[in-house]
Regions:
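Domain-level signal for soluble alpha/beta catalytic cores
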Residues: 1-139
């Protein structure tokens, strides 16, 4: 991710967002390569990222927990793109059980703790984003 940010900085004059995939273990969150999030965020900042965040692997409720930690690690805008729950196989295909309504509630929580942008990753559909937008207009 650091090399990608540095390259984008060199070759384009647009804002650069870098999101990473995290997993949770008993010691907390780490990238899928085992890297500490605070160190990784500092490296992305030093490389010139304008926006940092997390995507994929974890469901929206876990993303809220991770985002709280990330908010304490950086002043940069944060982008979060959680999965629609954890997948399970049904007839050989992944199925995500989280509803757009539950996902949107977690998205509102993400915004309330200082996340600047929320999207969706695996298992989400346009309906998930529509539900977030609908709930945002109610607040």
């Amino acid at each position: 991710a650091v090399i990608a940010v540095e390259s984008a900085r060199k070759h384009a004059s647009v804002p650069v967002a870098a999101t990473l995939t995290f997993m949770k273990n008993p010691r907390g969150f780490f990238t899928i390569m085992g890297d500490d999030p605070a160190l990784t965020i500092r490296k992305l900042e030093a490389a010139g990222a304008d926006i940092v965040g997390a995507n994929c692997t974890i469901a929206s409720a876990e993303m809220v927990e991770l985002a709280r930690a990330l908010r304490g690690m950086t002043e940069l805008p944060i982008l979060c793109q959680p999965n629609a729950g954890q997948p399970r196989l049904s007839a050989g295909r992944p199925v995500y059980d989280q509803t757009p309504e539950d996902f949107a509630l977690d998205a509102l929580e993400l915004f309330s703790i200082g996340v600047n942008a929320v999207g969706g990753c695996c298992g989400t559909t346009p309906r998930f984003i529509e539900e977030i937008a609908a709930r945002m207009t109610q607040h």
